[in-house]
From Swiss-Prot:
The lineage of its organism: Bacteria, Pseudomonadati, Pseudomonadota, Alphaproteobacteria, Hyphomicrobiales. This is 6,7-dimethyl-8-ribityllumazine synthase. It comes from Xanthobacter autotrophicus (strain ATCC BAA-1158 / Py2). Its EC number is 2.5.1.78. One of its GO terms (cellular component) is cytosol. 5-amino-6-(D-ribitylamino)uracil binds at Y30, A61, L62, E63, V90, V91, I92, N123. Keywords: Riboflavin biosynthesis, Transferase.
Length: 165
């Protein structure tokens, strides 16, 4: 029998295992207003979970995984460990092949980051055909994909900590 349940990171019982956690948000701000909405959703989830949040801003989605890697290396040097990463951004299809490159490489970069570091990563980089689709997914009151990416990272972090205990 398979059961499913929707969990909110704001529930106190679900915050167990997140004590002292530090989560890095790397946001591509090519579409400023959409970036604000994605960040608001992610921040709300992470703050409700009681984790420390750091935000790094980069120009666009393609730079998100690179900036995350740079931040992880710096964190190792300084001893200020990062427990999870949330990547945020928006890629809207245009008339050139550039969409496929940015969409695919930003997603691959985040997956590679998670695999190389055994690190919980939430991918909140929207890849859509239109700006209207982006808004439907980004708005906290609708799709809240920023919040969803943060919840994904927290879920993986809880799993990691539970398995390592």
């Amino acid at each position: 029998m398979v059961t499913t349940r929707k969990e909110s990171a704001g529930d106190a019982s679900l915050n167990a295992g997140l004590e002292g956690a530090r989560v890095l948000i790397v946001e591509g701000r090519y579409y400023e207003a959409l970036a604000d909405e994605l960040l608001a959703g992610a921040r709300a989830v992470l703050e409700a979970a009681g984790v420390e949040v750091e935000v790094i801003t980069v120009p666009g989605a393609l730079e998100v995984p690179i900036a995350a890697e740079i931040a992880l290396e710096a964190a190792e040097i300084t001893g200020n460990a990062v427990d999870a990463v949330v990547g945020l951004g928006v890629v809207i299809r245009g008339e050139t092949y550039h969409f496929e490159i940015v969409a695919g490489e930003s997603a691959r970069g985040l997956m590679d980051l998670g695999m190389a570091h055994a690190l919980p990563v939430g991918n909140g980089i929207l890849t859509v055909d239109t700006e209207a689709q982006a808004w439907e997914r980004a708005r906290v009151s609708e799709g809240n994909k920023g919040g969803g990416a943060a919840e994904a990272a927290l879920t993986l972090l809880r799993l990691r900590r539970r398995l390592e205990a």
